[in-house]
């Protein structure tokens, strides 16, 4: 059986690191060529996009996609990690907060904002992960970054000494929902942290198509659909969904196949999926200049 290749959408279980999921899928697929398009915290669940075989070449173009999350923010306590896994560093009664007050405090978080990432994060500071520095007792101060919160909806508010707020957000890549919880709590004067986080979307890939890991393991053992029992999106299917598309002529496809340049045509984007006349994903092109630049090639003879 040939090695599998394509894109797999997994529903990451709570308690698993993203690398744990990659390691499991490597065993199921029988290949080490497995990677993911964006880390999820161990506490979080939801969409994790994996590339297998040559599908790993597509991950570069998925990392920067917008993402959607469902989350629960707890107002009335702040933690060192900005989520429920960290030690509580302050607690203030939030019993006085009304839904109207919470909604008003949320308004400034919509749109383009400046956000300081959570200190306990995978961001590198002088070559070392921020979370490793925090765990070593260092005081880590990360620089603010520009992010966009294109949707911030409140679904439910559950009052008490602490107030739990169920939300749904759509955010740009690099946005920390934990930091949103922290900053909302600060804005309301009571502190806040995240107690639940579920990623519902990465770009065009949604939770409705995500596969349960245990079900994947059972399916793989039974030799179910897909290579090695894994229900993969083909390179062509993933490319058509995730990127702007250019349909090549036979002459253009032949030229690209021989490593020759072609003129840009169609979407003037940095990543355009270029397809042969018979529907094969041949390359990802940068078409921001008159002559298209090849970023990734998927030779037909290797299929």
Predicted segments — roles?
Residues 1-13, 19-36, 40, 44, ...:
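Accessory RNA 3′-end/elbow-binding domains used by RNA modification enzymes
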Residues 1-173, 177-209:
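Catalytic cores of RNA-modifying enzymes
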């Amino acid at each position: 059986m040939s090695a599998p290749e394509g894109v797999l959408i997994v529903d990451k279980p709570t308690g698993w690191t993203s690398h744990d999921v990659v390691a499991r899928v490597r065993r199921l697929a029988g290949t080490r060529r497995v990677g993911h398009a964006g880390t999820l915290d161990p506490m979080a669940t939801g969409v994790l996009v994996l590339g297998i075989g040559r599908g790993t070449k597509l991950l570069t173009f998925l990392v920067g996609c917008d993402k959607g999350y469902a989350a629960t923010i707890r107002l009335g306590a702040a933690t060192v990690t900005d989520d429920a896994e960290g030690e509580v560093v302050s607690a203030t009664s939030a019993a006085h907060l009304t839904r109207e007050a919470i909604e008003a405090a949320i308004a400034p978080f919509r749109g383009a904002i400046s956000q300081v990432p959570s200190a306990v994060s995978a961001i590198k500071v002088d070559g070392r992960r921020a979370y490793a520095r925090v765990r070593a007792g260092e005081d880590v101060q990360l620089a603010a970054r520009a992010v966009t919160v294109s949707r911030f909806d409140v679904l439910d508010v559950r009052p008490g000494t602490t107030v739990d707020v169920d939300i749904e957000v759509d955010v740009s890549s690099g946005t920390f929902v934990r930091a949103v919880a922290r900053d909302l709590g600060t804005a309301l004067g009571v502190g806040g942290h995240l107690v639940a986080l579920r990623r519902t979307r990465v770009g065009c890939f949604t939770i409705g198509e995500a596969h349960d890991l245990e079900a994947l393991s059972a399916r793989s053992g039974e030799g179910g659909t897909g290579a090695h029992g894994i229900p993969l999106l083909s390179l062509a299917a993933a490319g058509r969904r995730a990127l702007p598309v250019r349909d090549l002529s036979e002459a253009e496809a032949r030229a690209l196949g021989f490593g020759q340049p072609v003129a840009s045509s169609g979407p003037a984007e940095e990543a355009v999926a270029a397809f042969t006349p018979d529907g094969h994903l041949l390359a990802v092109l940068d078409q921001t200049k008159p002559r298209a630049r090849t970023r990734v090639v998927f030779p037909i003879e290797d299929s």
